[in-house]
Regions:
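Interdomain hinge/linker segments and adjacent boundary elements that couple functional modules
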Residues: 2-16, 20, 24, 29-34, ...
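Short glycine/serine/threonine/alanine-rich loop segments
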Residues: 27, 38, 203
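Key DNA-contact positions within bacterial/archaeal DNA-binding proteins
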Residues: 30, 40-41
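N-terminal membrane-targeting segments
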Residues: 36, 44-45
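C-terminal regulatory/effector modules of DNA-binding transcriptional regulators
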Residues: 164, 171, 183-283
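Positions in alpha-helical segments
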Residues: 16, 41-44, 257
Length: 283
């Protein structure tokens, strides 16, 4: 077992899942450590992501905890063996860790679903739009800090442009479409970009019009990241102080249902493009 000062988001998730397995098996850390032939301190360090864990140890722990879901177990194994130093590591000294965790989880996701009520999806923002958003972050960032955030956001978008892009589905409230971030020129360019991206086969954009009134999750910005198996999905919520990550199965099920409802309420992709085009022409 090895240590590192800043565990990756995926290593943290593996640690969380191993703790969940132990708790479901009804074992204390003392009993589990004894059966594994290790100390309680070492097991606690594994479950808190301070120590890494080998594939063989993951399989042994899963077997000891009577976990028969081999797809899930092997997904955990792959999470420990995949390349851990992604492009986001270059930002570790200049951006909050939560933004790096989001980039890492997105990079390894199989699909992404999002819903936004007051701003454009980060994965579909233009550089000028993102720059204007980050200029209004509190506490006020310096110009270099703004550019670091813009660069990081644009690099996240490689998910959509790479050779094997993810499936991306987003619902954006009409309010976010109409807000003229950066003025008419920047806002119009953002809408044209949104239209262009919506034409891609693997990208679905839907607008939730003002006319729907109240809807589930209003006021929330939600990123739902699909993992290799449903148990390893992640729901991420935007908060003023930074991103919040959720992995409890009951919450994952709730946010999947919420997104289902919002998507079924929103305009079709075709009607969405018509509305975005009309709003763009009025700017």
């Amino acid at each position: 077992m090895t240590t590192r000062p800043a565990p990756s988001a995926r290593r943290t998730r593996v640690a969380t899942e191993l703790r969940k397995l132990r708790e479901r098996a009804g074992m204390t850390t003392t009993e589990a450590a004894r059966r594994l032939g290790t100390s309680t301190g070492q097991l606690s360090n594994v479950e808190s992501a301070r120590f890494g864990v080998s594939p063989d140890r993951i399989r042994a722990m899963a077997s000891m905890y009577c976990c028969a879901d081999q797809d899930y177990v092997e997904a955990l194994v792959r999470m420990t063996t995949a390349r851990s130093h992604g492009w986001w590591e270059a930002y570790r000294e200049v951006l909050p860790s939560g933004l790096l965790d989001l980039a890492e989880l997105e990079y390894h996701s199989t699909a992404v679903r999002t819903a936004y009520t007051t701003h454009m999806p980060g994965l579909l923002q233009t550089p000028d739009h993102a720059r204007e958003i980050f200029r209004h972050v509190l506490p006020a960032p310096t110009p270099p800090e703004v550019e670091h955030r813009v660069s990081h956001r644009i690099q996240r978008q490689d998910l959509i442009y790479r050779a094997q892009p993810i499936t991306y589905r987003t619902v954006v409230h009409e309010a976010a479409v109409r807000i003229q971030v950066g003025g008419p020129r920047v806002a119009r360019a953002q809408l044209q970009h949104l239209l262009a991206m919506s034409e891609r086969d693997h990208v679905t954009v839907q607008v939730l019009p003002f006319g729907v009134g109240a809807f589930p999750g209003s006021g929330q910005s939600i990123n739902y990241l699909h993992g290799p198996v449903p148990q390893l999905d992640t729901a991420q919520l935007d908060q003023f102080h930074g991103p919040v990550f959720l992995d409890a199965e009951a919450l994952l099920e709730m946010y999947r249902h919420l997104l289902d409802v919002v998507e079924s309420t929103a305009l079709s992709p075709e009607k969405t493009r018509d509305l975005i085009h009309a709003i763009s022409q009025d700017m």
